[in-house]
Every structure is written in C-alpha cells, then in structure tokens.
Amino acid sequence: EQLPEDWRRFFLSPELTVQSVSGDNNVSGATLKKQAAVIQLINAWRTQGHLRAKLDPLGLNPPADVPSLQPGFWGLSEEDLLQEFSVTFGAHTTQMPLKQLLNLLEQAWAGSQAYELAHLENREEINWLLSRIESSNAPQADVQTCIARFEKLMAAETLERYLHTRYVGQKRFSLEGGESAIPALDTLTKRLRAQGVEEMVIGMAHRGRLNVLVNLLNKDPAQLFAEFEGKQTIGSGSGDVKYHMGYSSNLETPAGSLHVALAYNPSHLEIVNPVVLGQVRARQERRGEDGQAKVVGVLIHGDSALGGLGVNQTTFNLSQTQGYGTGGTLHLVINNQIGFTTSRLQDMRSSRYCTDIAKMVAAPIIHVNGDDVDAVCQVMELACEWRDTFRRDIIIDICCFRKHSGCSPWYARPLW
C-alpha cells in the first residue's frame, strides 16, 4: 500500500500473478529429489573425478576412494540404476538410465586422463571443455597416425638405450619412463601448424633434452655422439655441456613448414621460462596483429621444479598482462614422480598435484598416464585447440616414472 501507484500496477499485473498448476502433473516429490541427486552426482564427478583416475603407470599411487562419486552418497539406491533420468552430459540433454550415466562418467573423468576444472571461472570456457571431455564422438586416431606415434616412441626408446649402453656412466638425464613426451610433441607440432602457427619456441630443462634435440628437432645423432666423445672442433659452439644446448630447425608437417627453436638452458631449473616467453612476445610483435596466432611458446617442466621455484609463479602472474602476455602458453610436465631424491609426496610439497600452481591463473589442468600414448597425444590436441580458441595457458601433466635413478634410492633419499 505504501508503493507509488505505477509500482503497484506493475506488481499486480497479470504477468506476475500466481497461476494455478494443472493437477495432471504426476511428478512426485521423491522423483524430483532423485533427479536433484543425479545432478549432484554428475557435478561430483566433474569436480572430483580426477581423484579416481588411473594415472600412475607403476601403480604405486592407486586411485583414491571418493564416497561422493557413489550413487548411495546422494541417496540413490541399486533400484535406481535402471531408472531413467534427465541428464546434461557434454553438450546434450537427454534421458538415460543411471547405470549408463555412471559408465559414461567413469570413462570421461576417471580413465587414463583426468581433468581439473573446478577452479575455472568463465562459464563459456567450462562448457567448451565439458563438451569435449564428455563427448562420445571424439575422433579416434587412424592406423597411419598410430604407426607414426609408435615410430616416435621407438625412436625415443632406442636413442636412450643406445646412449645408456654406449656411454656408460656419462650424464645424459634420460627421458626413459617418460618417452611418450616425444610422440606428444610431434603431435603438437603437426596440430599447431594445421592451425596456422608458423613459429614455436620451447623452453625446457636438461631431462629429456637430448631426445628432444634428435627426435623432434632432427639434430644429427652423429653430432650428439661427437659431443659425448669430446670430438667437437675447438672454437666451435659455446663450450657448454651437451644437455644445455639449444637448437632450431624447420620441421616439415602435412600443413607446411614450422620453425621450432629450443632455447639454451642453464643448470638453474625453470629460469629459462620467462626468457622463452620474452622471445615469443618479441616474435609476435614483429609479426603485427596476428602475432599470437603465428607464434606459440611451449614450456616443459619438471614436477618438483614447477612448484618449487618462484620463477614459475612470476611467469604465470605475468601471463595474461597487457605488457607480457603471449596469448597462452602450452605447459607440459614430465612428472616422473621424483624430485631429485625425494619420491614421497609428503616430502615433496604441500599440495596434491605439482600443477596446482597453475590454478592461480585459472588454467585448465589435464593429468594423463604416460604409458597411454594415445591418451597423451589426445590431450595434446585438446590443449592446442584450447589455446587457439581462448588464447590462455593450459597445462598437461604427464604422469610417468624415472627408469634409471643414477644410484640406489635408499642412499639418495632423505632418511625416514
């Protein structure tokens, strides 16, 4: 009664008055409650499904027991497994039995791949990722693609085995246990070039560098062997050790030539990362408005060094700024589950994952079992598509192992 006349007419208008509901609606309160429980179950899988993923190729860290991923946690019974519910899965809303939904959730969120999206803030980005993660129409690799991946995998393994037997005791920082990174990087170069990228700059530490030099950048193996044998020409090169060396080459892909540069690396882990992104930014600015579409930065991290060194926090912090942003960096973690001599999680860090630092910039985080080469390459393709669409960072955590520890871990590890 105290409102002005025009506001009273507004609230009393027919459009806002309560309408009676037809009595032939047979949906019961119990049914609505179960439907709400199914929605909660789906959300639980999307936020906590990564805890159930099969990520460790050694099986030393089995998937966690997560009560909220079980229907019973939300009040659903075995009798409900055959009942159909309305669900939004991927990009579609449909009716399906609860049992079928559980199988789809398990496949999408707890296989060889695991996704962390709960820290993302942008609804468009979340929906984009959900439509791809939960898609049942994901393209499968054809025979020729699988053969190419196998050849890259064998090339990586063969090189490491040869160096191990030919140059016994020499430092080489083997990639063994994480060889799937090589077919993944090969997939990366082909996908980026198909998207129109013409230059890629890589920053990485020493582990796996020799393999990347030979099996990605096509460095002549004879030149690498000469470095092992001390046969370099006096006065040529920088005189630095072989696992610090940079290189550049033009890689031929089905979509054309891609120039790839691997930055030189000092022994101080991760310190090269801002240097690489500075190079990327300079190359982009030289190209003008479409620079971010033509030049991409790729950073390859170690698991303990990623969160352990402050330079990475600073690099992430500047990644979206006007003066230093590069339109998204592709981060790849060679996670061999051992930081120098420390393999127990409680001795390494205070967070569950080594990639948790990336949550500060709301970057999607993908964990993948390094022994599933097809899964590793599949998420690499997804990462390229993400960067091309949103111009933001994304991080892939390849969970693998270190085949040769250099000495007995019982001597090298801290006492406990």
Give residue spans per PLM region.
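Cofactor-binding active-site loop characterized by glycine-rich and histidine/acidic residues
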Residues: E198-G370
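Short alpha-helical segments and helix-capping/turn motifs at coil-helix boundaries
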Residues: A37-Q40, T88-F89, L102-N103, Q113, ...
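Active-site pocket-lining segments that scaffold enzyme catalytic pockets across diverse folds
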Residues: T158, Y162-A222
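Extended, charge-enriched "interface" segments that sit outside catalytic cores
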Residues: L3, F10-A181, V197
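Conserved phosphate/anionic-ligand binding catalytic regions in large, soluble enzymes, centered on
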Residues: Q40-P57, T187-L216, H301-T321, R391, ...
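Phosphate/diphosphate-binding loops
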Residues: V87-A91, Q223-K231, S343-Q346, A358, ...
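Electropositive phosphate-/nucleotide-binding environments in soluble metabolic enzymes
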Residues: Q95, K99, E179-I182, P266-N273, ...
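Generic secondary-structure signature for well-ordered alpha-helical cores
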Residues: A110, A114, A155-T158, K190-A194, ...
